[in-house]
UniProtKB/Swiss-Prot annotation:
Composition skew (Low complexity), residue ranges: 1-21, 706-734
Family: Belongs to the LIMR family.
Compositional bias annotation for Polar residues: 644-665, 735-746
GO cellular component: cell periphery; filamentous actin; membrane; plasma membrane; ruffle
Entries under Pfam families matching the protein: LMBR1
Protein name per Swiss-Prot or TrEMBL: LMBR1 domain-containing protein 2 homolog B
Organism of provenance: Dictyostelium discoideum
Region (Disordered): 1-22, 630-665, 701-751, 765-790
Main location: membrane
C-alpha cells in the first residue's frame, strides 16, 4: 500500500484470505527494541492520564469505593486504548505488506516507522483488550453492580445477594442460548471451528448494534451542540427549558424521599427501643439526610384502624427499605447538584448577555465603552484579568465553538460518506480514508491521520453514553456519579471498544488488498461465520446503513417526537421546547435569582479545566459557597448542618426521670433516659434519696407491696431477713460494689430483699465496666433468668 513499493507479480502475490490466520505468508520475527518499548510505555502513560482526567469529570475519588474506581479505570482504559492501537495496527499492517511485496528484510527500502511496534506485541494488546473486556463485562461488572445496589447490612450478605442475582440471570441466558444453538445446528451443519467463530460473531453483533446507535447519534449531536454554544441566546433558551425539567424532577424526588423517611419514622416508632431488629433500624436511620430531621421528628403516623395489625418486621423487609432509601438519597443528591449547576450556568449566561446588551447601548461613547470592558457577575467576583475574561466571553468563545462545530461537521460528513461507500460501493477508491492510507508512507504522519478520525469517533460514541439516562437506573452526574452508574458506563464502554475499532478498520479497507491479516482481524476474526451465502457476504455491511438511518432520526429529532407522542416518560427526553416552556423556565430562573440574592447566591460551576487544575494543584474553591463575599467567587451563605444526636433520631422523646442515689461514684444516664445522680449533702439528704430509688425499683420489678419501701430506717430488720442469703456463692458485684467490703447476694425470687441488702450499705458505686446495669433492671432482666457474672 506504500507509494514507493514495486508492483508485485501475479506469481509472487499470495491470494488474499478471509481467514483470521496469517495464511501462507510468514511474518518475519521481530524483536522489540528499546525505542519501541519506550514509545509503548509513553502511550500507556498518556492513555492512563487521559482516562484519569475523564473519570474525574464524573466521579468523586473520595466518595467512590476503591473497588469501583479500580475496575472502572480498567474499563475506561481499555476503551480509550483503541485510539492509539488502531493507528498502530494500520501502520504495522501497511509496513509488513510493503516488506512482503518487495521480498525484503525489515531493514530494506521499507523504512521502519518511528512509532512502529512488532506485530506480536500489537496482537497481544488486542488479545488483552478482547478477553479482558469479556471478563469485565460478563463476570466482574455485573456482580459489582448488584453488590453496589444491595441493601443488606453485612458484607457477606451483599456478596451473596449479588452472586445469587447474577447466577439466576445467567441461568436463564444459558437456557435461552442453548435453545438457540440447538435450533441453529438443526438448520445448518457446522464444524467446531465454524461454531466458535459463530459464537464470537454473535458476541460482536451486540456491540456492533450498540456502536451504530451511539455513534450515529453522536455524529449529529456533537456538531450541533458545538454550534449551539456559539450563540449565547441559544444557550440561554436551552437552559430555560432544562430549568423546567430539573425543577420538576427535584420536587418529585424530594417528595418521594420525604414520604419514605416518614415510613421509616413510622416503622421506628412502632418497633420500639428493644425490638430485635432495632440495630438494623438504627443503621437505616443513620443514613437518612439530616436536613429533614426537624420535619420528620414532628411527624406522627395515624393509628392503625381497629382490627388491623402492623406489618411484622423482617430482615428482608428492612433490606428493601434500606435499598430504597439509598436510591432515593442518591437521586435527590444528583437532582440537587444538576439543578445548582444549571442555575450557576444560567445566571452566568444572563450576566454575559446583559453585558453584551449594555455594550450595544454604549457603543457610541468610546470612553464609557472602554471603562466597562468587564463582565458584571451577579454571584461571583471578576477575576484579576477581567479584560481577557471579557474578550473571551464576548468574542473568542462564540467563534471558538463555531469553528470547532464546523470542523466536526466536516469530520462527520467524511465518516458518513465512508460508511456509505462501505455499504453500497464495491470500489474502495471512493473512500477518503482508503485513498489517504494508500498514498501516505507508514510513519508518524499516517498515525496522526488515523488518530484524528479515530478519536473523533470515540468522542461521538462515548459522549452519547455519557449523556444517556435510563430512567432512574443509570445516569452520570458531573463529579457526583454513584457507584452503579460509574461501573455501568465502564461496562458498556468496554463493549463499544472492539466494534468501534472494527468499524474504523472496515471503512479504511485495511484488509482489502493485503496478503496478510491485520493483528486486529487475527484476534477478532472477520465476522463471516455465516458462510458464503448472501447473508454472510453482506452481514458486515448492514450496520453502516443502519447507522445512516440513526443519523437521519437524530438530525430531525424524530426520537423526541415519537417519545412525546407516545408519552414514554421513562425515556426522560425533553420534548417540550415550545415558547411556553421557555417562558416557564424564565419565571423559574427569575424567582431563583431573587431568592438566591437574599440567601447567599449560587456556587459557581466548576469548568473542566478547573477540575483538571485541582488534580495537580490540590486547590479547592470553585463550586463551593463561602461565607465572605470577598472570597473566591463571592457566593456566600455556606450551609452548616446542625449537630444532631444520632442516637435519638426518628425516636419519640423519652420522659426523663431524675433519681438520686447516695454516694454514687458518677452521674449515670441510662438508655431509657433516666438520670441517676449522687447526693453528698449529708445523711439527711442521703436517707431521703432511699425512698425514691426504692419506690422506683419496686415499680420496675413488679413488687405490689409498699411495706418494704417504708422500712428504710430499720436496717436491722432487713439484715435479719437476708442473713440466710449472705452465704450464697452468687455475687452481685457486677452491679453494685462496696467501698469497704465485698458481699454476696443471693439468687432468689425476693427481688426487694436483693435491692434492700445493697441499699443498706449506703456506700456503693457503679462499676465502669458494665454501663447497661440499670437498663437491665428497668427491663426486668435482672434477677431470675439472668446469669450472674463472676
Amino acid at each position: 500500500m506504500s507509494s514507493n513499493t514495486t508492483t508485485p507479480t501475479p506469481t509472487s502475490t499470495p491470494t488474499p484470505t478471509s481467514s483470521p490466520s496469517i495464511g501462507p505468508v510468514p511474518i518475519p520475527y521481530e524483536s522489540a527494541s528499546f525505542g519501541n518499548l519506550l514509545f509503548f510505555a509513553i502511550s500507556l502513560v498518556l492513555c492512563g492520564v487521559v482516562v484519569l482526567i475523564g473519570m474525574k469529570q464524573y466521579i468523586s475519588l473520595k466518595r467512590t469505593p476503591i473497588y469501583a474506581t479500580f475496575f472502572s479505570f480498567l474499563g475506561w482504559f481499555m476503551c480509550f486504548s483503541i485510539a492509539y492501537l488502531v493507528p498502530l495496527d494500520i501502520i504495522v499492517t501497511d509496513h509488513l505488506q510493503c516488506v512482503i511485496e518487495n521480498n525484503e528484510t525489515l531493514t530494506g527500502e521499507c523504512e521502519i516507522p518511528v512509532t512502529y511496534l512488532p506485530y506480536g506485541m500489537i496482537t497481544q494488546q488486542w488479545r488483552f483488550l478482547y478477553f479482558g473486556s469479556l471478563i469485565l463485562c460478563w463476570v466482574i461488572f455485573p456482580v459489582l453492580q448488584s453488590f453496589s445496589t444491595a441493601g443488606d447490612f453485612r458484607f457477606w450478605e451483599r456478596v451473596k445477594r449479588a452472586t445469587k442475582e447474577n447466577v439466576i440471570l445467567y441461568t436463564f441466558m444459558f437456557i435461552a442460548g442453548l435453545i438457540g444453538i440447538i435450533v441453529i445446528l438443526s438448520v445448518k451443519e457446522m464444524d467446531p471451528s465454524s461454531f466458535l467463530s459463530f459464537v464470537m460473531l454473535l458476541a460482536n453483533v451486540y456491540g456492533v448494534i450498540l456502536i451504530t446507535i451511539t455513534m450515529g447519534y453522536g455524529l449529529i449531536d456533537v456538531p450541533r451542540n458545538l454550534l449551539r454554544k456559539g450563540s449565547h441566546y441559544a444557550i440561554l433558551r436551552n437552559y430555560r427549558v432544562e430549568a423546567v425539567v430539573l425543577k420538576t424532577e427535584l420536587e418529585d424526588v424530594k417528595r418521594q424521599l420525604i414520604d419514605h423517611l416518614k415510613l421509616i419514622k413510622t416503622i421506628s416508632d412502632r418497633a420500639g427501643q428493644y425490638d430485635p431488629f432495632r440495630i438494623y433500624l438504627d443503621v437505616i436511620i443513620s443514613k437518612c439526610p439530616t436536613e429533614y430531621d426537624v420535619l420528620i421528628q414532628e411527624y406522627h403516623a395515624e393509628p392503625l384502624p381497629a382490627g388491623m395489625e402492623a406489618e411484622i418486621l423482617s430482615y428482608k423487609y428492612l433490606v428493601g427499605i434500606h435499598s430504597t432509601l439509598l436510591d432515593l438519597v442518591d437521586r435527590n443528591h444528583s437532582a440537587e447538584v444538576l439543578y445548582e449547576r444549571l442555575l450557576g450556568k444560567a445566571f452566568a449566561i444572563e450576566d454575559i448577555i446583559e453585558t453584551r446588551e449594555r455594550n450595544k447601548q454604549t457603543a457610541g461613547n468610546n470612553q464609557i465603552a472602554g471603562e466597562e470592558r468587564s463582565i458584571q457577575w451577579s454571584f461571583k467576583s471578576t477575576k484579576s484579568n477581567g479584560k481577557f475574561e471579557y474578550l473571551w466571553h464576548m468574542y473568542i468563545h462564540p467563534w471558538y465553538f463555531i469553528i470547532a462545530g464546523l470542523v466536526c461537521v466536516c469530520l462527520s460528513g467524511i465518516i458518513l460518506w465512508s460508511e456509505i461507500v462501505l455499504a453500497l460501493v464495491s470500489n474502495p477508491d471512493y473512500s477518503p480514508f482508503y485513498r489517504a492510507i494508500v498514498r501516505m508512507e507508514p510513519g508518524i504522519g499516517l498515525q496522526i491521520f488515523c488518530f484524528i478520525p479515530m478519536i473523533y469517533m470515540c468522542v461521538c460514541s462515548y459522549s452519547t453514553l455519557f449523556k444517556l439516562r435510563i430512567s432512574n437506573y443509570y445516569r452520570l452526574v458531573p463529579q457526583q456519579s454513584n457507584t452503579f452508574s460509574i461501573m455501568f458506563s465502564a461496562n458498556y464502554l468496554c463493549r463499544l471498544a472492539a466494534p468501534l475499532a472494527y468499524n474504523f478498520i472496515q471503512i479504511c479497507h485495511v484488509n482489502q488488498d493485503n496478503s496478510i491479516v491485520s493483528p486486529f482481524s487475527k484476534i477478532m476474526g472477520d465476522m463471516n461465520a455465516f458462510g458464503d451465502n448472501a447473508l454472510g457476504k453482506r452481514f458486515t455491511l448492514f450496520f453502516p446503513i443502519f447507522m445512516i438511518v440513526v443519523c437521519v432520526i437524530s438530525f430531525f429529532n424524530l426520537h423526541k417526537r415519537l417519545a412525546g407522542s407516545c408519552c414514554i416518560r421513562s425515556l426522560r427526553i425533553v420534548t417540550d421546547t415550545s415558547e411556553g416552556a421557555v417562558d416557564h423556565g424564565l419565571k423559574i430562573l427569575k424567582q431563583e435569582r431573587e431568592e438566591r440574592s437574599l440567601t447567599g447566591g449560587v456556587a459557581p460551576v466548576k469548568t473542566r479545566m478547573s477540575i483538571v487544575k485541582e488534580m495537580f494543584t490540590k486547590k479547592k474553591g470553585a463550586g463551593i459557597l463561602v461565607t465572605d463575599n470577598s472570597q473566591l467567587d463571592g457566593a456566600s451563605g455556606a450551609h452548616r448542618e446542625p449537630s444532631i444526636d444520632s442516637s435519638n433520631r426518628y425516636k419519640p422523646t423519652p420522659t426523663k426521670t431524675s433519681i438520686n442515689i447516695p454516694k454514687l461514684s458518677r452521674t449515670y444516664t441510662s438508655a431509657a433516659g433516666n438520670v441517676y445522680s449522687s447526693t453528698q449533702d449529708g445523711d439527711e439528704n442521703s436517707n431521703s434519696g432511699i425512698k425514691p430509688i426504692n419506690s422506683f425499683f419496686s415499680s420496675i420489678l413488679g413488687e405490689k407491696g409498699n411495706a418494704s419501701n417504708n422500712n428504710n430506717n430499720n436496717n436491722n430488720n432487713n439484715n435479719n431477713n437476708n442473713s440466710n442469703n449472705k452465704n450464697s456463692n452468687n455475687n452481685n458485684n457486677s452491679i453494685l460494689t462496696s467501698n469497704y467490703e465485698s458481699y454476696s447476694t443471693p439468687r432468689t425470687k425476693d427481688k426487694q430483699g436483693l435491692l434492700s441488702s445493697a441499699l443498706d450499705k449506703m456506700d456503693f458505686s457503679f462499676q465502669d465496666d458494665d454501663d447497661h446495669t440499670f437498663d437491665d433492671i428497668e427491663m426486668g432482666a435482672y434477677g431470675t433468668g439472668r446469669k450472674n457474672k463472676k
